[in-house]
Regions:
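Beta-barrel outer-membrane channel/assembly domains of diderm bacteria
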Residues: 5-131, 150-162, 204-205, 246-306, ...
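The substrate-binding groove and active-site-proximal loops of carbohydrate-active enzymes
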Residues: 101-105, 132-140, 185-190, 240-241, ...
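Outer-membrane beta-barrel translocator/channel fold
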Residues: 165-233, 237-242, 247, 271-300, ...
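Hard-cation-handling environments
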Residues: 325-334
Length: 492
């Protein structure tokens, strides 16, 4: 008996040693980013109201990866000590994290952006992401946001892959119920059914080109209460006369091509969907303050919505230290906010599609928590990305030294469809314009160390009649918006 017990102990001990030797290697990896930027924003309402915003914002972002061998890992990303200087850290005081930004009191002590697992199954050449992570397409014109869901990346050949995914965009009225009627939330919504997104993409590489073909379908089942997650579930204001999106299909192609000294970046997409909520007026609850009414919130349409975006960026290396560039883009607009089809240019984005400093640069107050910038911010309510915008930009980048770069640009902006003057009663279809204006921008980066950069940015926007109508409803006010920005970035 003793010999048997001894043999069992030796066997168990040997097995444990064998398992310990065969166990996958566990690794902990991290990197991060610290940003502090000073903003000086002036005359964004063109003189209708006094507008002088000068403030500092900081963010410490950390990325962590817990790897268990080569085929499984847990990943998270969070932000620490984030907010406006001069505001102590405290818990949110508004309904929904994003609602804090327009009131300038965002001050998270900790905010989690990503939390997911990644695992690879070599036998089927497929990797999976499960949890909360970034969902994006192309150049981030139509989709760029963090959502909860699952996607699969299927390897095809040596370099190609197919991605398919499903994301939960909204758990209706912040309730786990899926009933069409529950007690209402702060915005009056009571339909607890959900909004979901389904995506697919094919990524390929050939020669010096990378190409992405993508498609997605979004469906919101929570519209019985005459509200839709897009746009009623957002905690920031969209431009006036925006349709509610109850379903949306998006199809597009995006890529890059390098030919000797010339680099091309391009994208084209088409959007088609429905606004099944029959609004009798433009009025709705103000997104940033649900107890108040936004008299010009909604587009009135026939239930159909559609749109498109076309984008081309060229950079040509004239010399080792000099690059000349051009950016051209066109996005669809609504030719009549009182009837007919509505216009849509995206699902949801965080504003990282960049053309200009003032007109379009509008990093939004989405859940990642980044201060709004540019005229596309929710307190000004101009366009973002290429919404009803036709843009042509000429630019140049000069490498003064290996550590110092200078960028300058001139951009002409025109509305794709006329922008109508408006009053609180609605749009004036007899008064419209297409001249949005022009902008001159400057940006310089200086590397103090290889991973520590100081940046200065400046933009001056000369408004046309159409941008005055868009923001103020009238061309009575004419001050030119301008902005100065300083940034210190430490990447580690």
């Amino acid at each position: 008996m003793k010999k048997l017990l001894s043999a069992l102990v030796i066997l168990v001990f040997a097995t444990q040693i064998s398992f310990a030797q065969d166990a996958p290697k566990t690794e902990f990896k991290f990197n991060g980013l610290y940003n502090v930027w000073g903003q000086m924003q002036n005359d964004f309402t063109m003189g209708k109201t006094q507008y002088r915003d000068a403030y500092y914002v900081q963010m410490l972002r950390l990325n962590f990866s817990f790897n268990y061998g080569d085929n499984i890992k847990a990943v998270t990303r969070f932000d620490l000590g984030q907010g406006w200087w001069g505001v102590d850290n405290e818990t949110p005081t508004y309904a929904g994290a994003s609602g804090m930004f327009d009131n300038k009191d965002t001050h998270y002590s900790l905010h989690v952006d990503h939390a997911y697992i990644w695992f690879n199954v070599p036998s089927i050449s497929t990797a999976f992401n499960v949890g909360r992570f970034n969902w994006a397409a192309g150049n981030k014109m139509v989709l760029d946001n963090n959502y909860d869901g699952i996607n699969a990346i299927i390897k095809v050949g040596e370099v190609d892959n197919i991605k398919i995914g499903a994301a939960k965009i909204s758990e209706g009225v912040l309730s786990i119920s899926d009933l069409p009627k529950v007690p209402p939330d702060s915005k009056g919504g009571y339909d607890a059914r959900d909004a979901n997104l389904f995506t697919a993409a094919y990524n390929t590489k050939f020669g010096t080109s990378n190409l992405e073909l993508y498609g997605m379908y979004y469906y919101d089942g929570s519209i019985e209460d005459s509200t839709a997650y897009l746009i009623d579930g957002l905690y920031y204001n969209r431009p006036r006369f925006t349709p509610q999106v109850t379903s949306l299909g998006i199809f597009g192609a995006a890529g890059t091509t390098k030919m000797d000294k010339l680099t091309l970046t391009y994208e084209a997409n088409y959007l088609i969907g429905k606004d099944e909520i029959d609004n009798p007026s433009y009025a709705g609850r103000l997104n940033t303050s649900p107890s108040k009414i936004d008299p010009l919130k909604y587009d009135i349409n026939n239930g159909d919505i559609s749109g498109y975006n076309i984008y081309l960026k060229l950079n040509y290396a004239v010399a080792e230290a000099v690059t000349l560039g051009m950016v051209a883009g066109m996005g669809s607009g609504d030719d009549d906010p009182t009837s007919g089809k509505g216009n849509v240019n995206k699902l949801r984005t965080a504003g990282f599609f960049y053309i200009t400093e003032v007109w379009e640069d509008s990093i939004m107050p989405d859940e990642e928590g980044i201060t709004p910038q540019g005229l596309g911010a929710p307190n000004v309510r101009a366009y973002r990305e290429l919404e009803n915008t036709t843009a042509l930009q000429l630019n140049s980048t000069l490498s003064i030294t290996p550590a110092w770069k200078l960028f300058g640009s001139f951009t002409y902006l025109k509305a794709t469809q006329p922008v109508f003057a408006w009053t609180a009663a609605g749009p004036d279809l007899t008064t419209s314009a297409t001249d949005l204006g022009w902008e001159v921008d400057l940006k310089t980066d200086y590397k103090i160390y290889s991973n520590l950069t100081f940046t200065f940015r400046a933009g001056y926007f000369s408004p046309g009649t159409a941008s005055k109508y868009l923001i103020n409803g009238s061309d009575k006010w004419e001050l030119a918006p301008w902005e100065l920005k300083t940034v210190i970035t430490f990447a580690f």
